[in-house]
Amino acid sequence: MTTATDRQAFHARLLEIGKERYHDKHPFHAMLHGGGCTTTQVRAWVINRYYYQSRIPMKDAAFLSRCDDPDMRRAWRSRIEDHDGGVEEGGGIRRWLRLAEAVGLDPAYVGSARGVLPSTRFAVDAYVSFVREKPLLEAVASSLTELFAPKIHSERIAGLLEHYAFADDAALAYFRQRLAEVPRDVEFGLAYVLDHADTREKQDAAAQALTFKTDVLWAQLDALYSAYVTPGRIPPGAWDGREGVIREPRAREAAE
């Protein structure tokens, strides 16, 4: 085992991964936040991102099933509640389906995940498997993309409000709520990683786990861009731009 670099330097290393690799720099997000997406492209993003959102509590449940420490389970289980909500209301998944309805999609269709791109499904399922199978330190480290999430949520709220008529408080409730939830989650996760990555090998593994997670996020956007922007090659079985649409866009929404 090699002596770990100091805590501050390791923290800086993790932040640098986000600076270089986080998906806020993907061209699809520039289009989305700048009002450059068509209605079809926005809907495709909502459909595919739903699959990621829906698997987050499954990922966290897999993590908890491996965790022997009750204090850690108590701290982590709120992540499942944040996404699944209560029996009748609340939760990020329900908020995301409100966004789906706001952009003219049938929430039941989106929730079925029938139109999800194969690459999206593959990337997200790989993330769930990673958390289920890797050491706890690496599983926690893979969640640290949350360090960089508040910036993109803020940019998304501002951009959608400026450019798309569907954007109102109800439609954007998911992002506003995440701005409140993420700081708590990332404080715990970051402290755990900094405390437990006590050798250089563990630090390297944690950094690689965070890099893997940025790849998962980037791969989803690459698939979306390829299918619905350019070259516009939609894989068999993926959303065709028509299924699940329940209304046409209003005047200020992105036009075909």
Curated annotation (Swiss-Prot):
Pathway: Cofactor biosynthesis; pyrroloquinoline quinone biosynthesis. The keyword Oxidoreductase applies. It catalyses: 6-(2-amino-2-carboxyethyl)-7,8-dioxo-1,2,3,4,7,8-hexahydroquinoline-2,4-dicarboxylate + 3 O2 = pyrroloquinoline quinone + 2 H2O2 + 2 H2O + H(+). InterPro entries: Haem_Oase-like_multi-hlx, PqqC, PqqC-like, Thiaminase-2/PQQC. Its EC number is 1.3.3.11. SUPFAM superfamilies: Heme oxygenase-like. One of its GO terms (biological process) is sulfur compound metabolic process. Belongs to the PqqC family. This is Pyrroloquinoline-quinone synthase. It comes from Rhizobium meliloti (strain 1021). The lineage of its organism: Bacteria, Pseudomonadati, Pseudomonadota, Alphaproteobacteria, Hyphomicrobiales. The gene is pqqC.
